[in-house]
């Protein structure tokens, strides 16, 4: 949570009510969380593109102040850094910089459909030799695919694409989109079980000022991957 959302969140926590964050983590203050391996998911997606021979791989990222966006961007960079061939190809584009928006192969889509479309156009115009793109959020995936259609780009002949989440949308796109999937049902079950456990603990004790930092729990879940027809083998 950030900005106005964080203020509401802080007030809620101070009231003593149990809180479970889903796919978010607080930087200042401990809180129960249910998280997926966002870093690993992005890393795996980019590695899949590399195995197909892609070297110039763009990424449409989310906002800097969102935990999941930072983790997915980290996974993207780790995958590129682990490949000495890709690292040499993209050396000038992946240098550590104070402002990540200076990186040509990264474009911020702000986790929105419109943002995804705008970021896709920017990547395409700034990187004419880009052969693949990883889109790190569902809404941005929708926007990016809309822009790809508007630009007349053929997938995967001209550009390979891996999106994020929503199996139904991935199946509706032509060609079928390869996507990272999140265990939505497991996330909901884990969050509900954790919250119920906290409510039971609260009922069993009269001490409402107990130290939450000693009892917070983080549950990690793995993502999946659905192979479509949107990635070309250019190796």
Language model feature labels by segment:
Residues 1-3:
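Active-site core of PLP-dependent enzymes with the aminotransferase class I/II
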Residues 6-7, 11-235:
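Bacterial carbohydrate/catabolite-sensing allosteric modules
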């Amino acid at each position: 949570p950030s900005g106005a959302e964080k203020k509401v969140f802080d007030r809620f926590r101070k009231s003593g009510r149990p809180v479970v964050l889903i796919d978010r983590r607080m930087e200042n203050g401990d809180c129960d969380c249910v998280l997926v391996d966002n870093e690993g998911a992005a890393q795996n997606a980019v590695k899949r593109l590399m195995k197909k021979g892609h070297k110039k791989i763009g990424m449409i990222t989310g906002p800097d102040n969102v935990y999941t966006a930072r983790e997915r961007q980290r996974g993207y960079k780790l995958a590129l850094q682990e490949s000495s061939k890709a690292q040499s190809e993209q050396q000038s584009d992946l240098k550590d910089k104070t402002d990540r928006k200076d990186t040509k192969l990264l474009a911020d889509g702000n986790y929105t459909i419109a943002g995804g479309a705008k970021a896709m156009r920017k990547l395409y115009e700034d990187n004419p030799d880009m052969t693949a793109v990883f889109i790190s959020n569902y809404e941005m995936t929708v926007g990016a695919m809309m822009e790809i259609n508007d630009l007349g780009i053929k997938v995967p002949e001209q550009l390979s694409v891996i999106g994020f989440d929503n199996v139904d949308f991935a199946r509706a796109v032509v060609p079928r989109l390869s996507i990272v999937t999140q265990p939505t049902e497991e996330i909901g079950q884990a969050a509900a079980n954790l919250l119920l456990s906290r409510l039971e603990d609260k009922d069993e004790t009269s001490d409402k000022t107990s130290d939450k930092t000693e009892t917070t729990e983080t549950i990690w879940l793995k993502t999946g991957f659905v192979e479509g027809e949107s990635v070309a083998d250019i190796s």
